[in-house]
């Protein structure tokens, strides 16, 4: 197998520009065949696979290509249409399907697309299965093709959205409502554009919608979780109680309090961990966070007697750590929140409902709930790169890192890493003084840009 084929799967499935390698129709057909081949290899017999997508224009062709590959191998496919990624995980379990596939590039721009694969339990598939799929694609060996009378059928699940809406609402306490709450909601013109407003409205909230008119080419376009300034302004303008921003596939959430201040994944994790611990519902009194988690948040959790386990960045790594340590809550600063009591992957809508529940039960505003959390000054800069050359092979970059670490001493830290899903290098500096961390982060970002870059992303 070539080096390129081994890199087919990244940290969150396969992702790239639509109609360019690896995100081509041809590869999607082969992937469908390979998924079918792996299912037959592990358990011969009849199989069923769920297929969902977000609102990208290219989703139609990838949906058709995957279904063609799957059905050609005798697999029954259940097509859901636009639905959040956590909806695919849920429907896969609810229909007792053998696998689920989500066609999405998450927070990436519309011209990208991607493919995420879930097991029958609703978890993202393991590295072992990803490697086996890649082997089948590389060798074009998918096992025995069925006779013409045994090819699979394709069915459209017309009530998929409705089922997921009811599932999400069921994670909110029975008998309680959101009556009296005014919510500004930004769905990023993505997969949650119908589902999310329905969930909050059916629970009696007043919902003001942004990013709920997808065109196929406006997903994540200056809206959603990556651009919370939209709901920051809207919350103030509409005098709302809270703002909720989701990303393109609905598995990530950023919130805004009634004062227009951002409440990121770190703070959501803290709010929910504190609540679960008070109710003796936090497994082992521990949570899983990542290397990006703010030091001030870690100190706050420690003050509550909550152990924080640190994983690599990526919801897949967070989940793996949760399963290994039997934790039921984990999350990332970027807004991937995993509540294993409810779902098997990050779920923006369910996460929002848990925070809203805590607000109602405690009769608190969102700013009240975060008032005791003092975050350390932190700077994060994204640098677009032409290629991902190993950072430890770049002497100038390594020298800059040593200088910054020396400047920070024991009072701060620096993290430099490539994104697992985009050609981006992320610079994070944390310390005691805001002006210092901003300056040091800019220094590193400029050096990375000069060595590898295609420009700093504001």
UniProtKB/Swiss-Prot annotation:
GO molecular function: magnesium ion binding; phosphoglucosamine mutase activity; phosphomannomutase activity
Active site: 106
Stored CDD domains: GlmM (cd05802)
Positions carrying Phosphoserine: 106
GO CC, any one term: cytosol
Cofactor(s) annotated in UniProt: Mg(2+)
Pfam families assigned: PGM_PMM_I, PGM_PMM_II, PGM_PMM_III, PGM_PMM_IV
Alphabetized InterPro entries for the sequence: A-D-PHexomutase_a/b/a-I, A-D-PHexomutase_a/b/a-I/II/III, A-D-PHexomutase_a/b/a-II, A-D-PHexomutase_a/b/a-III, A-D-PHexomutase_C, A-D-PHexomutase_C_sf, A-D-PHexomutase_CS, Alpha-D-phosphohexomutase_SF
Modifications after synthesis and translation: Activated by phosphorylation.
EC number: 5.4.2.10
A biological-process GO annotation: peptidoglycan biosynthetic process
PROSITE patterns the UniProt entry points to: PGM_PMM
UniProt catalytic activity: alpha-D-glucosamine 1-phosphate = D-glucosamine 6-phosphate
Cofactor comment text: Binds 1 Mg(2+) ion per subunit.
Keywords of this entry: Isomerase, Magnesium, Metal-binding, Phosphoprotein
Phosphoprotein recorded as keyword: yes
Enzyme type, top EC level: isomerase
Binding site for Mg(2+): 106, 247, 249, 251
Sequence similarity: Belongs to the phosphohexose mutase family.
Xref: HAMAP family: GlmM_B
Cited function: Catalyzes the conversion of glucosamine-6-phosphate to glucosamine-1-phosphate.
Name of the protein this chain belongs to: Phosphoglucosamine mutase
Organism of origin: Chlamydia caviae (strain ATCC VR-813 / DSM 19441 / 03DC25 / GPIC) (Chlamydophila caviae)
Gene: glmM
């Amino acid at each position: 197998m070539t080096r390129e084929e081994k890199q087919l799967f990244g940290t969150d499935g396969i992702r790239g520009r639509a109609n360019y390698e690896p995100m081509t129709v041809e590869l999607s057909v082969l992937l469908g065949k390979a998924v079918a081949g792996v299912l037959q290899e592990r358990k011969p017999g009849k199989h069923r696979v769920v297929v969902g997508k977000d609102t990208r224009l290219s989703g139609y062709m990838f949906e058709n290509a995957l279904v063609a590959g799957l059905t050609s191998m005798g697999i029954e496919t259940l097509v859901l249409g636009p639905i959040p990624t956590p909806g695919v995980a849920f429907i896969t379990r609810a229909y007792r399907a053998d696998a689920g596939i989500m066609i999405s590039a998450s927070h990436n721009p519309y011209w990208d697309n991607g493919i995420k694969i879930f097991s029958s339990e609703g978890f993202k598939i393991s590295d072992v299965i990803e490697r086996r799929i890649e082997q089948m694609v590389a060798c074009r060996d998918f096992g025995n093709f069925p006779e013409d009378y045994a090819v699979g059928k394709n069915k459209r699940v017309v009530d998929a959205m409705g089922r997921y809406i009811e599932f999400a609402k069921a994670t909110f306490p029975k008998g309680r409502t959101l009556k009296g709450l005014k919510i500004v909601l930004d769905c990023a013109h993505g997969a949650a554009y119908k589902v999310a407003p329905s969930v909050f409205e059916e629970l009696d909230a007043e919902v003001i919608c942004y990013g709920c008119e997808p065109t196929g080419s406006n997903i994540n376009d200056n809206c959603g979780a990556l651009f919370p300034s939209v709901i920051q302004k809207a919350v103030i303008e509409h005098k709302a109680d809270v703002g909720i921003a989701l990303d393109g596939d609905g598995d990530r959430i950023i919130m805004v309090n009634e004062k227009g201040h951002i409440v990121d994944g770190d703070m959501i994790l803290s709010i929910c961990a504190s609540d679960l611990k008070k109710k003796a519902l936090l497994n082992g009194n521990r949570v899983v966070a990542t290397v990006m988690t703010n030091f001030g948040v870690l100190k706050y959790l420690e003050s509550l007697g909550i152990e924080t386990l640190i994983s690599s960045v990526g919801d897949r790594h967070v989940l793996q750590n949760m399963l290994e340590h039997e934790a039921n809550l984990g999350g990332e600063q970027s807004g991937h929140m995993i509540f294993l009591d409810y779902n098997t992957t990050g779920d923006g809508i369910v996460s929002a409902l848990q925070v809203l529940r805590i607000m109602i039960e405690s009769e608190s505003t969102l700013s009240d709930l975060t008032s005791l959390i003092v975050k350390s000054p932190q700077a994060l800069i994204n640098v677009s790169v032409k290629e991902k050359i190993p950072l430890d092979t770049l002497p100038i970059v390594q020298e800059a890192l040593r200088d910054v670490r020396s400047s920070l001493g024991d009072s701060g830290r620096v993290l430099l890493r490539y994104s697992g899903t985009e050609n981006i290098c992320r610079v994070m500096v944390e310390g005691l003084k805001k002006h210092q961390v901003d300056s040091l982060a800019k220094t590193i970002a400029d050096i990375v840009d000069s060595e590898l870059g295609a420009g700093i992303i504001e």
